[in-house]
Amino acid sequence: MVNNMTDLTAQEPAWQTRDHLDDPVIGELRNRFGPDAFTVQATRTGVPVVWIKREQLLEVGDFLKKLPKPYVMLFDLHGMDERLRTHREGLPAADFSVFYHLISIDRNRDIMLKVALAENDLHVPTFTKLFPNANWYERETWDLFGITFDGHPNLRRIMMPQTWKGHPLRKDYPARATEFSPFELTKAKQDLEMEALTFKPEEWGMKRGTENEDFMFLNLGPNHPSAHGAFRIVLQLDGEEIVDCVPDIGYHHRGAEKMGERQSWHSYIPYTDRIEYLGGCVNEMPYVLAVEKLAGITVPDRVNVIRVMLSELFRINSHLLYISTFIQDVGAMTPVFFAFTDRQKIYDLVEAITGFRMHPAWFRIGGVAHDLPRGWDRLLREFLDWMPKRLASYEKAALQNTILKGRSQGVAAYGAKEALEWGTTGAGLRATGIDFDVRKARPYSGYENFDFEIPVGGGISDCYTRVMLKVEELRQSLRILEQCLNNMPEGPFKADHPLTTPPPKERTLQHIETLITHFLQVSWGPVMPANESFQMVEATKGINSYYLTSDGSTMSYRTRIRTPSYAHLQQIPAAIRGSLVSDLIVYLGSIDFVMSDVDR
């Protein structure tokens, strides 16, 4: 029998494991701290990964922040339990580790700093002295790993209830409910829970009144309609003026990152849809691309264009809901009902292509679930003919309304410096005049082949500017869809690669070896090489990213999900202090967030 199968394992992988020693920042660090001050880790993240000593963390961070082309944004910060990791060749000894992902806008480059920690000494200095947005990330890392950040202003739980015992992302913490004892709510425990819910301003970092003044404390949420989900903000008021406020999150926390450790690389795809439940396939994109980096898969051109098309459909769908609900929050009801008619047309198109509506789980490792159906182009053509006129009517009837402008212009305004300090991305960042959209700055899935513009504001990001940028982004998405319609490549909808999951069906019907592979990959899951990968995308609400660690298994060793809404809610107090409660409602409507994206 002649073997017609191609030996794809001998081909050049799509993503090389690199140490990035040629990146200028490595030379700058060595010149300042010496060649032996740190260990460079080779990964498939696409960015330099540098292990540094705990004692040098703040000095290195300050150095990077003050370079001629500085690393001005703390993009992400979290931890990892290294105790069960078997593939750690060449890395410093560590029971746990903390990573710091920094971005330089001027260089359009990133760097990841890592600090190794021993189990009996889980202490690291707080990064809040350099980047204020480290606050929530450090709280979450302590909450889920038990790593203490010395000097943190308010190191308390953020995802889990204050009475929770243990740190869920540790490897010795159960991942399934069946591993716990049955839940019992005794009278003593109920009293303890009620006591924990008692509001004490000093525990939230708020000051009580003095003899000459007193403040009112107001709960907004967690079930207020303008909170856009299970979200609570405690307001400290002097009359109608907001003196201070503290966002309270975690009500929607589902342990999505923990789930990644017990699902196969393939079976985790449906969970990605639900991280930001309005984004659909946009959420699948960074995860699938990160897994494909681990696997070394290059997908066909047709797959790239199909993925872009589905992503832009969901971007329009999300933006329509955002724009119409913002108008509703300001006080106009009608547009939200019209917008749902438009969104229904998108859902009909998505359902015709994928078989599902909100959460298709349609992208696959190495491709998409199936090819485009007959008639997809007609449905897309009808939508492209329909939408521009509708968008123009929303803008004319509502967004140019003088009352809406008066309620939103100049409200919750901030500049580029503040946006970068708080890790703001998406329209909130671009409204400050910074032209940074991942689709243009760091193209993925073939975005470099599309002709579209990035709307940018004039220097100040206020509620009105953020909304109007989203309107223009919607128009640009329509341009991209037009190009997808007119230039859809021919070819397969899956890559011809051993780790494509499920494998191309044609081979399973011809070769028993491929049928065996199909059985193993669908039942146990594909085995990804031990490595680390990272992928960021321009999601509907800002930059979303997946940082995956494989230990050579069928499941992820560590799945880190960085979402834009988390960073944007942390910024609320800095942007709204001194404003009125009514302004806060407008501000919340202008952020564009859903709590599943925040709490994961």
UniProtKB/Swiss-Prot annotation:
It is an enzyme of class 7 (translocase). It is a peripheral membrane protein. Its EC number is 7.1.1.-. Keywords: Cell inner membrane, Cell membrane, Membrane, Multifunctional enzyme, NAD, Quinone, Translocase, Transport, Ubiquinone. In the N-terminal section; belongs to the complex I 30 kDa subunit family. It comes from the Bacteria. Residues 214-600 are annotated as: NADH dehydrogenase I subunit D. It catalyses: a quinone + NADH + 5 H(+)(in) = a quinol + NAD(+) + 4 H(+)(out). It comes from Escherichia coli O127:H6 (strain E2348/69 / EPEC). NDH-1 shuttles electrons from NADH, via FMN and iron-sulfur (Fe-S) centers, to quinones in the respiratory chain. The immediate electron acceptor for the enzyme in this species is believed to be ubiquinone. Couples the redox reaction to proton translocation (for every two electrons transferred, four hydrogen ions are translocated across the cytoplasmic membrane), and thus conserves the redox energy in a proton gradient. Residues 1-190 are annotated as: NADH dehydrogenase I subunit C. One of its GO terms (cellular component) is NADH dehydrogenase complex. One of its GO terms (molecular function) is NAD binding. SUPFAM superfamilies: HydB/Nqo4-like, Nqo5-like. InterPro entries: NADH_DH_suC, NADH_DH_suCD, NADH_Q_OxRdtase_suD, NADH_quin_OxRdtase_su_C/D-like, NADH_UbQ_OxRdtase_30kDa_su, NADH_UbQ_OxRdtase_49kDa_CS, NADH_UbQ_OxRdtase_CS, NDH1_su_D/H. This is NADH-quinone oxidoreductase subunit C/D. Pfam families: Complex1_30kDa, Complex1_49kDa. The keyword Cell membrane applies.
